[in-house]
A protein has these predicted regions:
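Divalent metal-coordination and catalytic microenvironments
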Residues: 11, 46, 56, 94, ...
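Active-site metal-binding loops of divalent metal-dependent hydrolases
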Residues: 17, 57-59, 102, 123-124, ...
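Cap/insert and terminal regions of metallo-dependent hydrolase folds
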Residues: 73-82, 198-281
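Zn-dependent metallo-beta-lactamase
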Residues: 1-55, 59-63, 67-70, 168, ...
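Short glycine-enriched, charge-decorated loop/helix-capping segments at active-site entrances
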Residues: 29-32, 67-72, 134-136, 223-227
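Core dinuclear metal-dependent hydrolase active-site scaffold
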Residues: 13, 43-47, 164-197
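Metallo-beta-lactamase
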Residues: 2-4, 75-89, 93, 123-180, ...
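Active-site metal-binding motif and surrounding structural segment of the metallo-beta-lactamase
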Residues: 70-120
Length: 281
């Protein structure tokens, strides 16, 4: 971890939406006897004096985003831009966006940040284009993909604001690192490691884990559990989970899981607006 202040960040977990009654089996493979849970949707802000970085962006509830929100049972939503404004961040202030993967709830508002450079794994973007070109009978693969988000990524490429990554990158930005989790949740999912002054390196899991139970096993019994939904293999899912755990020496207080309410027990609540929370890591 760097000791340079420009290479460490203040990190915030920003909740912007919730779905109701999600089957636990869709989060934890094979766990059919635990009923349903409500699910938070979140993204991360990492900032210092030099940079304002988003790790994922959430989605806008209009057009195709509204249709996907209805499809996936999003019962409550507030604009990610409004959530950022609560922390004093304007869209034009965002310098960089690191995308963990291309699902609608993670890159659904990239067009709202006109000055930001975008970073995504090359295989993630290109293989989604391949998947979109398959016959409609393969629609399971693209169920959580918004084609308009892919179009917006290509528009960013036209403006020379898109960087396609090929594998792991240390110091993608000073103090921000990415690790490829290929063929796990998605074709080119990645998790992000952010250096902080207080906690040291912190992992933003993206959807390499849906729940802390993916990391700890049911009731903390210690056996990794693959995700209940993905386009890759269970084996790869477990390998990525293990990488994340080793990254933080099994310290769960240094892993941010974006779809688990349990994280509010690990991080200090900075503010709460109409039930939506922002935590400082």
């Amino acid at each position: 971890m760097s000791t340079d202040p420009s290479a460490t960040y203040d990190v915030y977990v920003i909740e912007y939406a919730r779905s109701r009654n999600q089957p636990v089996a869709s989060l934890l493979l094979g766990v059919y006897d635990r009923g349903t849970v409500d699910l938070p949707f979140s993204f991360v802000l990492a900032r210092n004096a030099e940079r304002t970085v988003l790790i994922d962006t959430g989605f806008m509830r209009d057009g195709s985003g509204a249709a996907l929100a209805e499809k996936f049972g999003i019962a409550a939503w507030v604009s990610p831009l409004e959530r950022l404004a609560a922390l004093g961040v304007r869209p034009e202030d965002v310098t960089d966006i690191v995308l963990t993967h291309a699902h609608y709830d993670h890159m659904g508002s990239i067009d709202r940040f006109p000055n930001a450079r975008l970073f995504i794994q090359k295989r993630e973007l290109l293989q989604w284009i391949e998947a979109m070109a398959l016959p409609a009978r393969f629609g399971f693969l693209t169920a959580a993909l918004d084609a308009e988000d892919v179009h917006e990524a290509l528009r960013a490429a036209e403006e020379h604001r898109l960087t396609l990554l090929e594998g792991d990158r240390r110091d993608l930005l000073p103090g921000i690192h990415v690790v490829l989790g290929a063929d796990s949740h998605t074709f080119g999912s990645q998790y992000v490691v952010v250096d902080t002054a207080v906690r040291g390196p912190v992992v933003v899991a993206g959807d390499c884990a849906y729940s802390y139970a993916n990391l700890t096993g049911l009731d903390g019994q210690g056996t990794y559990i693959p995700l209940g939904f993905g386009v890759g293999s269970h084996y790869q899912s477990l390998m990525v989970i293990d990488k994340m755990m080793r990254e933080v020496d099994d310290d769960l207080s240094r892993i941010i899981v974006l779809h688990d309410f349990e994280r509010w027990e690990r991080f200090a609540i900075e503010r709460e607006d109409d039930g939506f929370r922002i935590a400082r890591v």
